[in-house]
């Protein structure tokens, strides 16, 4: 019974719509009304501005970390359950009960789970994420390559549970980014205003 309640609580934590709350309360905007209409960090940066976007990023990471830490907080099981419970927060973020089962793509929330489970891998994942953005100028590309490399690294270090969960997250994030992947193939994906590929595109237009 306690474990079931923990999963429900993790889902509810993940369901907290950080982007919508910050947008409405502090910016008097709803990120769902502009840009990509997504409630996550990237669109929050675009619609609400860098300060609000950064706040959304940290809150979404915190959601994953807090939800994944519930088994330890309630002393219910071993450290491995952190990853499994964390998945409930990912589902909550993507299909929030507070937003009629719509939501974001759960990249930051997934990273928060990794922070709770293995802080070193979180740092590695963050470094990969930033590096890919600086090269490709695409958040969507970084959102897929990051978990892919973490899954490979996990299997290489014989952390089979993390490797399995990272693979599941990779599949889920790939599905959530299916429209972005189509735009990448067509050469029409949105770029952040920095990075090597962005500079290349700017020079090409001149």
UniProtKB/Swiss-Prot annotation:
Belongs to the PlsY family. Catalyzes the transfer of an acyl group from acyl-phosphate (acyl-PO(4)) to glycerol-3-phosphate (G3P) to form lysophosphatidic acid (LPA). This enzyme utilizes acyl-phosphate as fatty acyl donor, but not acyl-CoA or acyl-ACP. The chain crosses the membrane at residues 3-23, 47-67, 79-99, 119-139, 152-172. InterPro entries: G3P_acylTferase_PlsY (IPR003811). It is found in: Cell membrane. The keyword tRNA processing does not apply. Pathway: Lipid metabolism; phospholipid metabolism. Keywords: Cell membrane, Lipid biosynthesis, Lipid metabolism, Membrane, Phospholipid biosynthesis, Phospholipid metabolism, Transferase, Transmembrane, Transmembrane helix. This is Glycerol-3-phosphate acyltransferase. It comes from Latilactobacillus sakei subsp. sakei (strain 23K). It catalyses: an acyl phosphate + sn-glycerol 3-phosphate = a 1-acyl-sn-glycero-3-phosphate + phosphate. Its EC number is 2.3.1.275. One of its GO terms (cellular component) is plasma membrane. GO terms for biological process: phospholipid biosynthetic process. Probably interacts with PlsX. GO terms for molecular function: acyl-phosphate glycerol-3-phosphate acyltransferase activity. It comes from the Bacteria. It is a multi-pass membrane protein.
């Amino acid at each position: 019974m306690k474990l079931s309640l923990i999963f429900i609580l993790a889902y509810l934590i993940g369901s907290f719509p950080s982007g919508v709350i910050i947008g409405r309360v502090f910016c008097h905007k709803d990120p769902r009304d502009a840009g990509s209409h997504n409630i996550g960090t990237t669109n929050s940066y675009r619609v609400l501005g860098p300060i609000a976007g950064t706040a959304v990023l940290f809150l979404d990471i915190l959601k994953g970390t807090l939800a994944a830490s519930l088994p330890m907080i309630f002393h219910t099981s071993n450290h491995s359950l952190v990853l499994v419970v964390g998945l409930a927060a990912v589902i909550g973020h993507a299909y929030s009960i507070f937003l009629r089962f719509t939501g974001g793509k759960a990249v930051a929330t997934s990273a928060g789970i990794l922070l709770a489970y293995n802080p070193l891998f979180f740092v590695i994942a963050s470094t990969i994420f930033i590096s890919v953005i600086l090269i490709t100028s695409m958040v969507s590309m970084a959102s897929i390559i990051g978990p892919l490399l973490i899954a490979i690294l996990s299997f290489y270090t014989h952390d089979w549970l993390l490797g399995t969960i990272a693979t599941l997250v990779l599949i889920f994030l790939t599905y959530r980014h299916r429209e972005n992947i189509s735009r990448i193939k067509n050469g029409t994906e949105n770029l952040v205003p920095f990075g090597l590929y962005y500079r290349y595109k700017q020079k090409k237009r001149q």
